[in-house]
């Protein structure tokens, strides 16, 4: 069961199902009651935490997802596809293009509206969803496509984490921040002490790590920095192999519980009974910037990166059709974009709801466009592979020289 939930296809399917169910239920007669329940608060006075149920998911449970993202980032930088400048160059430039162009598209559409603060929303790529769509529709494509998408999404996540840390930190409490930093350092020390431990000693180390992680989360939340940054810092703090083991253990919970719950709670939005002309500019900015901005930005960045790489004597990246396909997958914002919308439009409930709908619409357009393109590319790749296999079989079965001489290749 856990191996099934780890599947990229299943993870993407659960995310999509949860979002659809949340959106549908929110617009039924049960919707108002469910929305009121989701916005109800659950307080822990002893530690000074008072969050709505939505925020317990986005500020609490989602930390697990960001911990796993940080572990994957660290692995890619130390031993994966980003462990050298030459390997990281093209996806890095493509990732920058995939952030800058959507932000510019959004700002161009919302200029003068007072809603420019939402520019980070269309800059994110949902790594789990994008890889899931690729796994479903991209069979037979070169392995380099998945490697490039993974590197691109990892770098995109790194930029998104930086945006959250820099632009969504308010009222910094230096005392709480000091506790959070101390917690991360202690987490790193305990993590290294746990290397090679077995039995009761290993259980004790894991229990201590969980306790330190909870304290670090509380201190980060109290400091004014978004709590998901705690997950990022803790993920980077663990030794690489220990982090990979921890991420592997947490992945079923993240894919099967955390991400679907977040998608469900974020999609609990009542569709406004207004005309298209009455929608806020932020809606159009996000809905267009995700599929269109990402397509243009990643493609242009990838082509620029390939040119720079060739000038340096390195490999030039993907073929243009595959780069366009990856660019469409990059337009699937979903998880991180939904979080960005929640943060950017805090206090503007109507705009936040429209932002959520725009993320769902823009990501949906990107999913459909990517699925169609992947299906076409995949069909051609499988056909080319079958033709090559037939050609090889013909050469083996019918040598050019029947007299025992060498067959001609």
UniProtKB/Swiss-Prot annotation:
<feature type="transmembrane region" description="Helical">
    <location>
        <begin position="203"/>
        <end position="223"/>
    </location>
</feature>
<feature type="transmembrane region" description="Helical">
    <location>
        <begin position="257"/>
        <end position="277"/>
    </location>
</feature>
<keyword id="KW-0739">Sodium transport</keyword>
<feature type="region of interest" description="Disordered">
    <location>
        <begin position="384"/>
        <end position="409"/>
    </location>
</feature>
<dbReference type="InterPro" id="IPR023171">
    <property type="entry name" value="Na/H_antiporter_dom_sf"/>
</dbReference>
<feature type="transmembrane region" description="Helical">
    <location>
        <begin position="60"/>
        <end position="80"/>
    </location>
</feature>
<feature type="transmembrane region" description="Helical">
    <location>
        <begin position="356"/>
        <end position="376"/>
    </location>
</feature>
<feature type="transmembrane region" description="Helical">
    <location>
        <begin position="89"/>
        <end position="109"/>
    </location>
</feature>
<feature type="transmembrane region" description="Helical">
    <location>
        <begin position="283"/>
        <end position="303"/>
    </location>
</feature>
<dbReference type="InterPro" id="IPR004670">
    <property type="entry name" value="NhaA"/>
</dbReference>
<protein>
    <recommendedName>
        <fullName>Na(+)/H(+) antiporter NhaA 2</fullName>
    </recommendedName>
</protein>
<feature type="transmembrane region" description="Helical">
    <location>
        <begin position="10"/>
        <end position="30"/>
    </location>
</feature>
<comment type="similarity">
    <text>Belongs to the NhaA Na(+)/H(+) (TC 2.A.33) antiporter family.</text>
</comment>
<keyword id="KW-0406">Ion transport</keyword>
<feature type="transmembrane region" description="Helical">
    <location>
        <begin position="148"/>
        <end position="168"/>
    </location>
</feature>
<keyword id="KW-0050">Antiport</keyword>
<feature type="transmembrane region" description="Helical">
    <location>
        <begin position="118"/>
        <end position="138"/>
    </location>
</feature>
<keyword id="KW-0812">Transmembrane</keyword>
<feature type="transmembrane region" description="Helical">
    <location>
        <begin position="328"/>
        <end position="348"/>
    </location>
</feature>
<keyword id="KW-1003">Cell membrane</keyword>
<keyword id="KW-0472">Membrane</keyword>
<keyword id="KW-0813">Transport</keyword>
<dbReference type="GO" id="GO:0005886">
    <property type="term" value="C:plasma membrane"/>
</dbReference>
<feature type="transmembrane region" description="Helical">
    <location>
        <begin position="224"/>
        <end position="244"/>
    </location>
</feature>
<dbReference type="GO" id="GO:0015385">
    <property type="term" value="F:sodium:proton antiporter activity"/>
</dbReference>
<dbReference type="Pfam" id="PF06965">
    <property type="entry name" value="Na_H_antiport_1"/>
</dbReference>
<dbReference type="GO" id="GO:0006885">
    <property type="term" value="P:regulation of pH"/>
</dbReference>
<feature type="transmembrane region" description="Helical">
    <location>
        <begin position="171"/>
        <end position="191"/>
    </location>
</feature>
<comment type="function">
    <text>Na(+)/H(+) antiporter that extrudes sodium in exchange for external protons.</text>
</comment>
<keyword id="KW-1133">Transmembrane helix</keyword>
<keyword id="KW-0915">Sodium</keyword>
